[in-house]
Design a protein with these regions (language model features):
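Residue(s) in the substrate-gating loop at a strand-loop-helix junction
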Residues: 106
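C-terminal helical subdomain
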Residues: 145, 168-203, 210-212
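Alpha-helical segment proximal to the catalytic Tyr-Lys
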Residues: 93, 134-139, 201
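Active-site helix of classical SDR
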Residues: 88, 122, 130
């Protein structure tokens, strides 16, 4: 699920072509009705819902908190906090056989982020939601979060002012990532698989950093 239909349709087609099974559901996570429809689509097509990954997030607004507009603040809250809460509520109502929820937080939740304080505060709130949902939904539903480090996604590159991939090597050196490279989406995907699998059956309420040691 994502806002851009063409992108999710391509991902679903790739999964189906490789022998998996997927459906594409264009979804704006800031719309609670769309989240309800998404959760129900999973049940209708697959027969049940057992896993939710809250992966939508970000903020293109940058600047000191004292200069942030009320709209930019609210947009960040709607996308990064309210959507996580609303999607979890929509999924939990349908997780009749138990399940696992993974929230994608961020390393910025750990401390002050001048110029992006609203986003850091939102991700800190995601961690708090993760811990509380984990307590409230145990033992049938496990809830954990992943805190990614620097991964050159479209949103991160825009936030750091990198125009294209040619600027990444210099930025990686500047950031001094211990593992020596930026992360990849697959690094986060592997952590999600762990947190949704029986291998993490006694893990809940945890924030897992996947940061290359940063």
């Amino acid at each position: 699920a994502a806002r851009r239909a063409a992108e999710v349709e391509k991902v679903a087609a790739d999964i189906n072509a490789k022998g998996g099974r997927a459906i594409a559901v264009p979804t704006d996570v800031t719309n609670s009705q769309a989240l309800e429809a998404l959760a129900q689509a999973a049940v209708d097509d697959f027969g049940k819902l057992t896993i939710l990954v809250n992966n939508a997030g970000g903020s293109r607004a940058m600047g000191p908190l004292t200069e942030l507009s009320a709209k930019d603040w609210q947009d960040c809250v709607d996308l990064n906090i309210t959507a996580v809460w609303a999607a979890t509520i929509a999924a939990v109502k349908r997780m009749t056989e138990g399940g696992a929820i993974v929230n994608i937080s961020s390393l910025v939740a750990r401390g002050p982020i001048p110029g992006s304080g609203h986003y850091g505060a939102a991700k800190a709130a995601v961690n708090s939601l993760t811990e509380t949902f984990a307590r409230e939904l145990a033992p049938n539903i496990r809830v954990n979060a992943i805190m990614p480090g620097y991964i050159p996604t479209e949103v991160m590159m825009a936030a750091l002012g990198v125009a294209d991939e040619s600027g990444l090597p210099a930025l990686a050196k500047q950031l001094a990532i211990p593992m020596g490279t930026f992360g990849k989406p697959q690094d986060i995907g592997a952590a999600v698989v762990y947190l949704c699998s029986p291998a993490s059956g006694w893990v809940t309420g945890q924030m897992l950093p996947v940061t290359g040691g940063h």
